Amino acid sequence: MSRRKQAKPQHLKSDEELPPQDGASEHGVPGDGAEDADSGSESRSGSEETSVCEKCCAEFFKWADFLQHKKTCTKNPLVLIVHDDEPAPPSEDFPEPSPASSPSDRTESEVAEEVAPTEGSEVKAATKEAEPMDVEVSTDKGPPGPSVPPPPPALPPQPEPAAFSMPSTNVTLETLLSTKVAVAQFSQGARAGGTTGAGGSVGAVAIPMILEQLVALQQQQIHQLQLIEQIRSQVALMSRQPGPPLKPSASAPGTASVQLQGLTPHAALQLSAGPATASAGSGSTLPAAFDGPQHLSQPASGTSTPCSTSAAPPDSGAHPACSTGPAPGAVAAASSTVGNAVQPQNASTPPALGPGPLLSSASNLPNPLLPQTSSSSVIFPNPLVSIAATANALDPLSALMKHRKGKPPNVSVFEPKASAEDPFFKHKCRFCAKVFGSDSALQIHLRSHTGERPFKCNICGNRFSTKGNLKVHFQRHKEKYPHIQMNPYPVPEYLDNVPTCSGIPYGMSLPPEKPVTTWLDSKPVLPTVPTSVGLQLPPTVPGTHNYTDSPSITPVSRSPQRPSPASSECTSLSPGLNNTESGITVRPESPQPLLGGPSLTKAEPVSLPCTSTRTGDAPVVGGQVSGLPTSAATAVTDSACTSLGSPGLPAVSDQFKAQFPFGGLLDSMQTSETSKLQQLVENIDKKMTDPNQCVICHRVLSCQSALKMHYRTHTGERPFKCKICGRAFTTKGNLKTHFGVHRAKPPLRVQHSCPICQKKFTNAVVLQQHIRMHMGGQIPNTPLPEGLQEAMDADLPFDEKNAETLSSFDDDIDENSMEEDSELKDTASDSSKPLLSYSGSCPPSPPSVISSIAALENQMKMIDSVMNCQQLANLKSVENGSGESDRLSNDSSSAVGDLESRSAGSPALSESSSSQALSPAHSNGESFRSKSPGLGHQEDPQEIPLKTERLDSPPPGPGNGGALDLTAGHPGRPLIKEEAPFSLLFLSRERGKCASTVCGVCGKPFACKSALEIHYRSHTKERRFVCTVCRRGCSTMGNLKQHLLTHKLKELPSQVFDPNFTLGPSHSTPSLASSPAPTMIKMEVNGHSKAIALGEGPALPAGVQVPTGPQTVMSPGLAPMLAPPPRRTPKQHNCQSCGKTFSSASALQIHERTHTGEKPFGCTICGRAFTTKGNLKVHMGTHMWNNAPARRGRRLSVENPMALLGGDALKFSEMFQKDLAARAMNVDPSFWNQYAAAITNGLAMKNNEISVIQNGGIPQLPVSLGGGAIPPLGAMASGVDKARTGSSPPIVSLDKASSETGASRPFARFIEDNKEIGIN
């Protein structure tokens, strides 16, 4: 016996709805009409002779048997067993309550509707099926229609008890989109409370049981019906060849074919209605009809002969369209392939059913896929209220046709749901109980449970759960494949493994050279159609036409659904497809019109392009097939297909649209939330019109404020400035985070003392202002009363102009602020130092002496602690030149700030680099110019920041080396001034007080060592990730990627991830060591320190003469440095001693010191030497009282702190005595006078802006330091060699090792490389 899984309360309702006499009269139900009415609930639809037990769903074709069974029926049986000789027509099993059903009918209908809100319509469908011709094909079923309304009174009594007595379970079988079945559990309490009506008598608990039973059965029936209708529609569409009219049963298919134009379920119902009508004559007719179709399918399988088998009464005569009925062979093939393609066939449903049986069985059954409810039926606020709707969402077909709420106005079955309670629960997820505002939202949500990802990228094959996600993803391919259009239609996942003749998987585009629309050709299932969808047979499946790769032939008007992303697009292909006059259908770049809403269905005249892969290889020739008869409208007629060299999608003309106006459908489309969502998604294609889209990089932001902030990454604008230090930030949040730096108090509230009057200050900014007052004569150089001093300090506001200018220098700083201060990385502000500074050729200038507030802090502290330590200063006098030159270069580079990449190409910079005077006005102007967005992208590739560092004569020894001076500690060995990244030695700094993940420089704690290592790059200025476009360096890959967005790079070049541009092994230290003291050009590629040896007088793009030493080695790597760095070649630097490989020459050089024992970086305070500058910096923190969190995010560059000190030398043991003030006052007065002069000149000229840096060189300084005007830039170059010979007065004074005048020496400073501690 065959197992009939029946869950539709429709049967119960339909029996109730259908008058017993109608049921008997129509279907020849055995037994009295009343009996039929009662039992008709089960047997009414389809063939009235069948009675279904409400408890166990058993089917009985004899009323007496049915009554006998009811006496002994138990709730346990969930499956109805149908006699083998009597194939239970799905319609009978699933009749839905008719709208006119009586209260009891409504109760059952409510149950049914709760099971599936659409079931109400299904009931109508059932009634229509029982009388289907009446509803749609009135020819055969005039009487059945009327019979439906009367049954309600008779039906009520039985359905209630039976329904309420049915067992209840928490588990129901439901179809998920891409799965055969799924188990859903419902709360029984909810269900119990959900049902009302006649069931109340039985008890609240009984109703949930009934509902659950019905749901389980209905789901199974829905699957069967869906498969049946799919096959039927496929057959009607594909086998629509003119032929002898089908016999009565075939006529029904013909009828359906007419309706298939709309491809709406009701059409399928009509198709089946014919057979049902025929079967109405005799109770056994329905099984016969069912068998008949099967018979048809069997012999016809594989054949394209028209369905001539007699499966139904001459009902077909009413519909000449039956000629379009699918050929049995096509039906068989379609049933097997299409059914499989669309959804797994239910075991209960024969895969190859003839069109007749499919139609007949389906015709009796309401279309479960469409939301259908009888207006008269009541829907309870039960979790199962919209079981049918959710079932649709879970059904594989539903994935394609998900958003169809509208119903053809001419089909009463599709009346809108009348229940006011339905809307809330009808979009409730049955798995997680979430409630959604629309069916489409629910269906999308269900994919999270099913894991279905129906949308496939036709370029890379990635799958997505929503079309919106696919659209967003597809934008990645737009730049590389602008000619390939996205496939907006769902591609069943099983097709990924289906071989194609072209070798390209379904849903994937052909190679770019092939037509844009090729993805259509490879898609077997383009449309998201209702229950009956024309699905293209896979190339391997025999079809009426050779559809090797052709898209499915489904009329555009087929979808009454609202425009879900899938269905709407399938509903009407983009208008561009209409341009088939040329014989080649052109698909518009985007299927935007598909989502238009009502217009979607209106764009019916469409012919999909036929690719050469199809049979005939001929392009689709015809345009619209407007002349086709209505029957042909459902599918391309054979003649039309033959006329087209290769089968093309049918072009549906307006006349067909007139037949299926879908007025109500359009309304639902317009109001559908899904359609709105679709329109938003479609706008992605038209995002140029998006008000929140960046016009530079086309990125769409969430809101105008986000867009405004985004533009700052392109313009470099930093509107939020710190009032204390002048730093500017792109966002207020970053500024607030930065304020924490100023709020942080030094560990012991270390006070900075004024070197002139010894007044203590806790704020370096106040100290700086105080010193300015000394210099300006506002305060005498003798200690003043505290009150007066502080009053003056308060009166002197921080120079606003200075802050303004400083804001232009924060790009470099901002990056660190993002990384450390605010942990927000504003990579757009990655610093690139485009300026040339020749520190080696000139003595340190006052601006370099007091270039930053932080330097002042450190300087004052060191002055207090080692003020009289002149001996050590004398020892370091030789190195002072180079050390101070380093300081100057660092300071100058630190001031670049916003100039970094934006004004790198500014002609003004290069022009002024050699001639601009160090004036506040110029520095301000320069900084403002650099801030202008216009200059932001002017990047002169030739203007590379170069720093020449003259290797000084051999320093006395490594122990005496400049604090952070990278110049060689060995006379003959020049050192690349490469800022080596901090090593893990930081983690074990001498103090040992910091945790392993605490920054040894700024004391900032981190969660892990990797984060700490990245953070150290902010101190070392290591920027290993170099942008190949503008050569800016970034400390992290993420920052680089962010930075690349400013270049509008969609596809990141491989060179983007190059590490620091490093010299080849030939340019590494060994080669440089050959010359005793070659002039070193320090190339800062976006903050990376690159040192190369310059040949004599190399021409530099900045127009600045590069000072050259007597013996210079021209580095062939200079030219490459002017171009984007080459792609990284991993580990190209080999250690000759141990064979280890390193990625950069600097790393190799540092490593080699482990073999040589070289420690070129000596602490000038305690004499301890270190192998790396970073280690020395960390060590210097042990000598600093103000090494507080306030210095967080700042890089400490200790540049020969002792050089500043003149006067009597102090023993090391005396450095840390407490009487610093007293000792400071013991210094020769001339020292402080010179110091004041230097400060006056430096601060008065806005030393923090250091226009010298902006100008790319050191302009003439009006200040005389130590008895001589600083030579102009030109003289600097020529005087490089003279620096040590004493020919240059300022340099001579610097080189003097005597302690005659400490003022002649540059002041010791702790300077942050490329950053000024206090200001930036």
Curated annotation (Swiss-Prot):
InterPro entries: Sal_C2H2-zinc-finger, Znf_C2H2_sf, Znf_C2H2_type
Biased composition regions of type Polar residues, renumbered to the chain: 295-311, 543-554, 569-583
Keyword Lyase: no
Tissues showing expression: In adult brain, testis and kidney. In lower levels also in adult ovaries and embryonic stem cells. In embryo in developing neuroectoderm of brain, inner ear and spinal cord. Also weakly and transiently expressed in embryonic branchial arches, notochord, limb buds and heart.
Record keyword Nucleus present: yes
Biased composition (Low complexity): 40-49, 271-289, 323-342, 355-367, 555-568, 834-846, 902-923
One Pfam family here: zf-C2H2
Classification via SUPFAM superfamilies: beta-beta-alpha zinc fingers
Keywords: DNA-binding, Metal-binding, Nucleus, Phosphoprotein, Repeat, Transcription, Transcription regulation, Zinc, Zinc-finger
Zinc finger (C2H2-type): 51-73, 427-449, 455-477, 692-714, 720-742, 752-774, 997-1019, 1025-1047, 1133-1155, 1161-1183
Extent of Pro residues compositional bias: 88-100, 143-160
Chief localisation class: nucleus
UniProt feature, compositional bias: Basic and acidic residues: 121-131
Family: Belongs to the sal C2H2-type zinc-finger protein family.
Protein name: Sal-like protein 3
Organism annotation: Mus musculus (Mouse)
